[in-house]
Swiss-Prot record:
It comes from the Bacteria. Its main location: cytoplasm. It holds the Pfam family UreE_N. SMART domains: UreE_N. Belongs to the UreE family. Keywords: Chaperone, Cytoplasm, Nickel. GO terms for cellular component: cytoplasm. It is found in: Cytoplasm. Involved in urease metallocenter assembly. Binds nickel. Probably functions as a nickel donor during metallocenter assembly. It comes from Azotobacter vinelandii (strain DJ / ATCC BAA-1303). This is Urease accessory protein UreE.
Length: 166
């Protein structure tokens, strides 16, 4: 099994490729296969953004592995004007939908409920097969640089209690 534990910088050549869906690219622990069929174990640092199309990984044996975004069934959304597109993005954001933003269009994973909502908002929606590269959250994935429970990032669990019990 090819073991991969770290990301690395892009290079002009590589030894193997992984073609992964967004869900697979979002995992830090994953068993998968190269495009040539070799068994791979991913053990990446937790709390990092998903792997993106064109990212590079360094295997334990020194091989370079390039990541490709696997084409997925997506909804491609366009609108008559910027206001309508912004309104569609607003409603999708309220539902915490992963969203790829292009020049005059939005893409999201295929979902018939969201497709119906978008059509009701007046959007033009078509189904496409394409790699999915959604925006990352503006506030990151909660990653920090403390180690071993350092006080700066060591927060005690908190139970939220709504109302008073007697």
């Amino acid at each position: 099994m090819l073991m991969i534990r770290q990301r690395t910088t892009a290079r002009p050549e590589w030894d193997a490729e992984l073609e992964l869906s967004l869900e697979a690219r979002s995992k830090s622990r994953l068993r998968c296969f190269t495009t040539a069929g070799e068994d791979v174990g991913l053990f990446l640092e937790r709390g990092q953004p998903p792997l993106a199309d064109g990212d590079f990984l360094l295997a334990d044996d020194g091989r370079l592995v390039r990541v490709r975004a696997r084409p997925e069934r997506l909804l491609h959304v366009a609108c008559a004007n910027a206001f309508e597109l912004t309104r569609a993005a607003y409603h999708l954001g309220n539902r915490h939908v992963a969203l790829q933003i292009g020049d005059g269009w939005l893409r999201l994973l295929d979902d018939y409920v969201l497709e119906d909502m978008l059509r009701q908002l007046g959007a033009r929606v078509e189904t496409v097969e394409a790699p999915f590269q959604p925006e990352h959250g503006a506030y990151g994935g909660g990653h920090h640089h403390s180690h071993g429970g350092e006080a700066e990032f060591s927060y005690a669990p908190k139970l939220h209690q709504f109302g008073v019990r007697k």
